């Protein structure tokens, strides 16, 4: 819940001096990316900008405090300020900020700018007290903000020092409007106006000018002069002389003498107690100070000129001027040290009563009251956890004694979930085991079950499916239906374990159940996870269309719940890329893989390994080995600089082994094979993939017998577990083994089975990457004219893809090939005396490649009637009457030229 006063522009008071000369300068702010107002405390930065902002509706205001160094808190308020300025235009960014569904501040800002691209009016965002920001991540994100903000947006920043926002670069590019302390200092005319409004008896212009000069136009000093003159009998000029040359760091003594010592004791205590509040309203003041009418007291303090300012138009929220507030807090620690814990405790209770647990925690920590802190956490910690207030929760839990956690085991569970969210898996089990040992009395079955659900999640994350299944089952046996979050976790883990075991049907049912529960209780990240798992299961079963439709549901969920910046989004676009690749939609597959890399742009480069492997895979399917090698260099560099799950390594190894196959690099394959551990099982599609990598390397090295043993066992497991996509892949690799071993009949048998299975999977690229060996076999099958219609159509499609992406010169009879052919001593006389045109040679090459007339016309981009004319002419020149004769003639020419066909 956001504090309204932090988003309210200060109210312009009647007695303030209108700074016309500075307002004139600020009137051109819309021509700059950044308007920067810098000066020490008390020069009127906030007052000036609030005067300038008056009447501007498309303006958001964000007043910072020290707590805004938390990235999530900073983001929430900044987006809320933009929403204030645009009347709620940026809904997606708002949801992402509220639910912490973004990878980084920069990526959140990128989404914001996408939405602001449709906002065409001038827009202003004011950030006050930026000097309070010390988090370098926020500085870097704001530099990103300034580089990429829309042209119609101006950022206005007030700070006591020069912020780390790339100021020099903006200045050089004339994109910076600056106002500093010299310009903010009051001139003689403004000082005269100021005193005329503050003092009951007017003073001469000359005296006003002298006082202004004595304090160098410092607004705070002028205000103190006026305050002293009203409270004391000595003249304003005496105060001016005392303040001459003083600065903010030496004000304390003056403020004690001239302010605190000149108010009654009740007012003094009111000021000191209320100063612990960063912002205050009637209820807070009443509870903290004990005075009955807090609002009236605040208005009285404001009338006395004691540096209090209204923070909203309704007059409900107030705050002290930062300079005076800091002074009062220091004095409070000295003068009311014994009472201070009680004051903070009262503040915490009041913030809780108004529904602001984060502010209440701040005061409970300051009070050192573990009981209060414990009670707040017991009631609100899980809500804060679900809103990703992780840093605040961690600080709070550290402040509680271990005994307090043991007395309230759900706080132990919360601490364990915090560790899990930070991937500190080993610490989770250590913490839970210690808690179970030391908790006094018997733990309830429900609490045990919650512990086990979390342990199950840790176990599956650590690659221990057996333990994960045991713990998930224990949790589900004991968890009441109402304990929905832990039930969602345990059900998801159980489904994932069954997926790993190859029990796809039961896994699918559990993942569908997880999705239903997660949607019902708005646990969106588990809903998304379950959809991704369902898609993977459908893919493994060979139901790629069902996988596609499930992915569409997941994309819709991401859009509706603004989950675009969760790392899981990368998982989804990656499996979409895998599916597109399988169907030979290579451009779309590549774009999807690149979007996955973009999702992970704020994470460590190692996280991009799988998407990078997919980019290599796209290059391999296109036959672009140069680009594949460039990408492989990046991939192998990542492999050498990180620790990865076995599934990730398997996917990376797959493209490496295929590349070695295509380039004939037996040395690399042999070296890899000697170092690669063999998986213990092959009962899921992850393990099948690594065994396939091993078999492919063995085939490349001519180790046909061990490769055949591997592939036959893989097929047996795949048939038993209904891993139909893996069976399809295994058959294609077995086909290559038989072909290279000279077992042509076996090769043809498994190829026909693979083509039949591809009617279900839709596979194209898996055939294409096998290159010319696959093309030769498909040509023969097409010539035999024995394939069923669907398989025949797929075989022709695969041939087109091979010819498009793996353009062997002999398949297309290009000019160089034809020239060498005509100069060959054994070329048939008929070819010499009646030479084919270049176009006719191209047509012959495409006929040999298995193209139909329509496909040849499409390839050469000419009319079908033109192709018929070319075919008739080349038949006549070759002395053949039928298509099969032309294919055989082309085959003889290729053999004569030394190509093994």
Curated annotation (Swiss-Prot):
Q: Name one GO biological process term.
A: positive regulation of DNA-templated transcription
Q: How is its activity regulated?
A: Activated by ATP and maltotriose, which are both required for DNA binding.
* Gene3D superfamilies named among the record's database cross-references: P-loop containing nucleotide triphosphate hydrolases (3.40.50.300), Tetratricopeptide repeat domain (1.25.40.10), Winged helix-like DNA-binding domain superfamily/Winged helix DNA-binding domain (1.10.10.10)
HTH luxR-type domain mapped to chain residues? 829-894
Q: Which InterPro entries does this one have?
A: P-loop_NTPase (IPR027417), Sig_transdc_resp-reg_C-effctor (IPR016032), TPR-like_helical_dom_sf (IPR011990), TPR_MalT (IPR041617), Tscrpt_reg_HTH_MalT (IPR023768), Tscrpt_reg_LuxR_C (IPR000792), WH-like_DNA-bd_sf (IPR036388)
Question: What start-end ranges are recorded for coiled-coil regions in this protein?
Answer: none
Concerning SMART domains, the annotation shows: HTH_LUXR
UniProt binding sites for ATP:
39-46
SUPFAM superfamilies, sorted:
C-terminal effector domain of the bipartite response regulators (SSF46894), P-loop containing nucleoside triphosphate hydrolases (SSF52540), TPR-like (SSF48452)
> Which GO-annotated molecular functions does the record name?
ATP binding; DNA binding; DNA-binding transcription factor activity
The residue ranges marked as DNA-binding region are 853-872
One short Pfam name that applies is GerE
What keywords sit in the KW lines?
Answer: Activator, ATP-binding, Carbohydrate metabolism, DNA-binding, Nucleotide-binding, Transcription, Transcription regulation
Q: Give the function comment from the record.
A: Positively regulates the transcription of the maltose regulon whose gene products are responsible for uptake and catabolism of malto-oligosaccharides. Specifically binds to the promoter region of its target genes, recognizing a short DNA motif called the MalT box.
What family does the database annotate?
A: Belongs to the MalT family.
Q: How does it assemble?
A: Monomer in solution. Oligomerizes to an active state in the presence of the positive effectors ATP and maltotriose.
Q: What is this protein called?
A: HTH-type transcriptional regulator MalT
Coding gene?
Answer: malT
